[in-house]
């Protein structure tokens, strides 16, 4: 128990002070206002204008200095107590400023943990969406049961602020944060991805949501480490950046005194946890009994610690060999491969059946076709159609738009074990591009291709990937052919294409 107490004492020393003065720095709001809102992958794009005006920021700072932040007029509820008018505009800038300031201590902690783990160079690859799939290929073939968990949401804003206080020691900062949340959103309501608060304040909402998930995972992984002597080195970068606060001391003492036998029963060195897009996967080699124990632990953790009601029926436990789970735009399951080997010993011949497991990752063709139909590239019968709204663009811009979509889908789904579905998607986009060009020139598809000779240009839909791989492996044709059959994971994909988000 002493090593846990030392760890907690060290974490308390890293708490940050004096964030409140940073709220009134001009450059904070300059960074906030020039932030690219369209890079958000969790909430819908809000579409703010990214023009920057230092004069507007200076006026904002001046008016914030002149206001008395401790007095709220109850008779004038429609008027902004901070600035008097244009509440939505200033709410957006102030919330972005809050998010930038509060991200500073967590960024410093993450940077120090990366330096201690000596994996700064590989941090960019760990941010990739595809970095999760090589881990699944290495680990999931040895596991038997999987549990799909949807992280419960919403959570009350007051609970988030209280949890945040254990990380940052700055009372004026949190008073101002509470005042801001009270005036610019409904304090008694819950924060959800589709709420007005999350749409108008995307960066602050994303920070609060990610902080809530980080807090939940820190407790979950703390007990995971406590219940096993083996460390999960595969995800050390994510574990090392999680810091515990003084509130855990009581938790450590309780589990050490009263629940030691229970934790021994939980001991499972082959349990793995993966989180993605508000969901998580818990997989284990042991039977369903241990998985049920972890399931009920998660439910009690959400109900008791975060005051979120969650029912046991929302978490399903399935056998990997008989269940396909939807993961980041893929259908994934563990397939059993059976092979028969003939063995001969003296005059006797034996037939030995060997069963091996392989992670099968497939492109979900039906949801992807549905996304193409929703984007008006084809109809519900999978027949390509033209895109008349792009008719005002030049031929080069139209072809470039289709190629960009095809390129993004090709890169994202190149890890599929069966690529025939991907070729079908390329075929639909290719014909949709041809029909769009023919509709623009008011002619038929056959006449357009015959007149303009665009067949060679449109072959880029199928030859671009081959050209990229030929540059990487210029002298190995056999290697190139093998790469087309195998999976290729790209470690530079930070945001998924809009057509991929069909879950």
From Swiss-Prot:
One Pfam family in the UniProt entry: MatK_N
Domain of life the protein comes from: Eukaryota
UniProt key word RNA-binding: yes
Keywords: Chloroplast, mRNA processing, Plastid, RNA-binding, tRNA processing
GO molecular function: RNA binding
GO BP term, example: mRNA processing
GO CC annotations on file: chloroplast
Subcellular location: Plastid, Chloroplast
Family in the record: Belongs to the intron maturase 2 family. MatK subfamily.
Function according to Swiss-Prot or TrEMBL: Usually encoded in the trnK tRNA gene intron. Probably assists in splicing its own and other chloroplast group II introns.
UniProt xrefs under PANTHER family: MATURASE K
Protein name in the entry: Maturase K
